[in-house]
């Protein structure tokens, strides 16, 4: 299968970054350590910029007096060398700002590093002993298939691909992949933000294409009961211990519901046990990111939409982050159109209530409007949607509907939260407009 993209990247395994060769094809990404002769021959120049009077943030060992090359023995977290992100333990330092250190003593190397100035260009090279260790690193990459081989192939179907958050990746060079089960993840670091953009776009495009096949397989397994109309990984904004964060979720849309899972369900029984269910008829999209808004990294570059659902516990809000504007458009359209079609399929809902102290039943019908039945089934009143002037609720049990003169405002005690009826009423009104072909 033809490669979509190939190149050197760093992967985070066992607490350290390791350089590997990554090759992407339409269904999988393959990771392998570089051939020893290639890796040993690869010399690279890393620019480190010191700040606020701090040093490079490395310790070295070796030198002519020890019959060793000058080797990085420690990289101090948070300091300049660590922030550069391209230096590794046991890298051999060949030169500092053009000054050759291949034959330097330890003391000469220390002096060269100290007088290097604020901007330091280090030419470095992987060490032979380090490469012997690196050859097996991809065998330690964990994924759902639990296959450990010298060349690691990771399937992309139903994998989650996302950009790392601003807190973890100020330079925009890190991508994150999560396995379908949600148990394993892999961080991949590129040489620049532009390189990361290219890798992300290629990976995301592959996973998106594979969703079509996965969706068909899911519906075959479920026997279209329910029929899954749309599905995929998203990140939901949650609060844990007072801290707001984005948590990966697997979200699906059926003919009537939005289902949230912690990961991709593997068995039919798992599909029947979502973490959370929201009815489409009582859900609406209330806010989306704008393509034209100015982009401020870490603030307005998050692509998201917000849904609100009327429930017996009141209004529940879900803020959903996706990775591309195309993905945003697909999700928003799926939720909005799915809501209309769910209303068309449902066509009528009813709820027990009190009206003027009497037990009644409120009927909301897509074609006939709103009606109220007595406990004996007598129609107490009935009004079309067109006669509604205004609606309101107290955030609790009470709903007000103003039909204008001569009938005026009617107050209903819905015994539980009025929000489901309020949301469904508005969904029915929007569906009538959609049915007229006025939805763009």
Swiss-Prot record:
GO terms for MF: acetylcholine transmembrane transporter activity; calcium channel regulator activity; structural molecule activity
SMART domains tied to this protein: PDZ (SM00228), PH (SM00233)
All copies of domain SU, residue ranges: 384-440
GO biological process: acetylcholine transport; muscle cell cellular homeostasis; negative regulation of locomotion; neuromuscular junction development; positive regulation of locomotion; regulation of backward locomotion; regulation of egg-laying behavior; regulation of forward locomotion
InterPro entries per record: PDZ (IPR001478), PDZ_sf (IPR036034), PH-like_dom_sf (IPR011993), PH_domain (IPR001849), PHsplit_syntrophin (IPR041428), Syntrophin (IPR015482), Syntrophin_4th (IPR055108)
Protein function: Adapter protein that binds to and probably organizes the subcellular localization of a variety of membrane proteins. May link various receptors to the actin cytoskeleton and the dystrophin glycoprotein complex (DGC). May also act by slowing calcium channel activity via a direct or indirect mechanism potentially involving other second messengers. Plays an early role in the formation of the neuromuscular junction and is necessary for muscle maintenance.
Family named by the database record: Belongs to the syntrophin family.
Protein name, per record: Syntrophin-1
Lineage of source species: Eukaryota, Metazoa, Ecdysozoa, Nematoda, Chromadorea
């Amino acid at each position: 299968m033809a490669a979509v993209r190939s190149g050197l990247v760093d992967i985070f395994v066992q607490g350290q970054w390791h350089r590997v060769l990554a090759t992407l094809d339409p269904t999988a990404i393959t990771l392998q350590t570089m051939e020893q002769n290639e890796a040993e021959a690869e010399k690279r120049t890393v620019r480190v910029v010191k700040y606020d009077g701090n040093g490079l943030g490395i310790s070295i060992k070796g030198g002519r007096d020890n019959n060793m090359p000058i080797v990085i023995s420690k990289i101090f977290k948070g300091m300049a060398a660590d922030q550069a992100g391209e230096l590794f333990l046991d890298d051999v330092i060949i030169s500092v700002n053009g000054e050759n250190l291949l034959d330097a003593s330890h003391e000469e190397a220390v002096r060269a590093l100290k007088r290097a100035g604020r901007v330091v260009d280090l030419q470095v090279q992987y060490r032979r002993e380090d490469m012997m260790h690196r050859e097996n690193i991809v065998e330690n990459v964990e994924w759902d298939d639990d296959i450990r081989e010298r060349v690691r192939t990771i399937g992309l179907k139903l994998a989650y691909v996302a950009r790392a958050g601003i807190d973890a990746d100020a330079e925009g060079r890190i991508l994150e992949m999560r396995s379908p089960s949600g148990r394993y993840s892999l961080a991949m670091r590129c040489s620049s933000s532009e390189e990361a953009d290219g890798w992300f776009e290629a990976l995301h495009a592959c996973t998106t294409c594979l969703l079509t096949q996965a969706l068909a397989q899911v519906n075959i397994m479920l026997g279209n009961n329910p029929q899954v109309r749309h599905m995929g990984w998203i990140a939901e904004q949650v609060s844990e211990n007072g801290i707001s964060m984005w948590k990966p979720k697997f979200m699906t849309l059926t003919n009537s519901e939005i289902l949230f899972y912690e990961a991709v369900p593997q068995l039919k029984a798992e599909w029947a046990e979502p973490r959370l269910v929201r009815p489409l008829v009582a859900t609406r999209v209330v806010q989306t990111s704008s393509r034209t808004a100015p982009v401020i990294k870490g603030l307005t570059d998050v692509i998201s939409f917000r849904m609100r659902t009327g429930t017996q516990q009141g209004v529940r809000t879900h803020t959903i982050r996706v990775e591309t504007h195309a993905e945003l458009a697909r999700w928003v359209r799926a939720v909005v159109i799915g809501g209309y079609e769910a209303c068309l399929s449902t066509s009528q809902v009813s709820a027990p209530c009190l009206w003027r102290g009497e037990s009644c039943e409120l009927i909301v019908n897509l074609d006939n409007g709103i009606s109220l039945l007595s406990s004996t089934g007598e129609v107490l009143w009935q009004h079309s949607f067109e006669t509604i002037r205004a609606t309101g609720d107290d955030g609790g049990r009470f709903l007000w509907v103003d039909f204008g003169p001569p009938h005026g405002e009617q107050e209903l005690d819905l015994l539980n939260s009025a929000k489901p009826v309020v949301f469904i009423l508005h969904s029915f009104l929007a569906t009538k407009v959609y049915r007229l072909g006025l939805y763009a």
